[in-house]
Amino acid sequence: MKVLPDRPRLFRVVVALGVMALAAACGSNSPGSAGTTASPAASAASGVDLEQGTATVMNAQETVLTSPDGFTLYYLTVDTAAAPKCTGACLSTWPPLLTNGNPSSMVPLSGTLTVAMNANGDQVAYNGHLLYRYAGDKAKGDAKGEGLQAFGGVWKVATPALTVAG
């Protein structure tokens, strides 16, 4: 007597293997894979965790707020959470720190972290100051954006001691 394979079972196994292969291919981020990736600075992270680091600011080491990837954060002196001045072309030089959840800090902060829903997206603010990265900072500890005048105001390094906007 010849035993034939259980066709419905074989079909389910083949379908399951195909689904797993497809899922693995979609999750791949290897070179040559399709899809686009956003810059870490401009991408939204779920529940951003701010950190502190040190940066050379005006020839002195200073404690600064940093993005989850360790880069110095800044604020624009004329920005408001409801109506940011840094929009459009500004965002390519000063990408906003965006979030998909509640921001928090990996270290104790005396101020308040909030999310401002504005034209830039759900942007993280510290003590009412919208936070940005500077595209000119190429390494952790850089603070090359400090004191730059652009987009109607002065760019300042965000520190844990940053006072409430007002």
Place the predicted regions along the sequence by residue.
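Bacterial N-terminal signal peptides that target proteins for export
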Residues: 2-14
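C-terminal motif of bacterial Sec signal peptides marking the signal peptidase cleavage site
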Residues: 21-25
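Bacterial lipoprotein signal-peptidase II cleavage site
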Residues: 26-38
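N-terminal low-complexity, Pro/Thr/Ser-rich intrinsically disordered segments
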Residues: 35-58
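Short, low-complexity cationic-aromatic patches
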Residues: 53-71, 116-129, 166
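Extracytosolic low-complexity repeat regions of secreted or lipid-anchored proteins
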Residues: 108-163
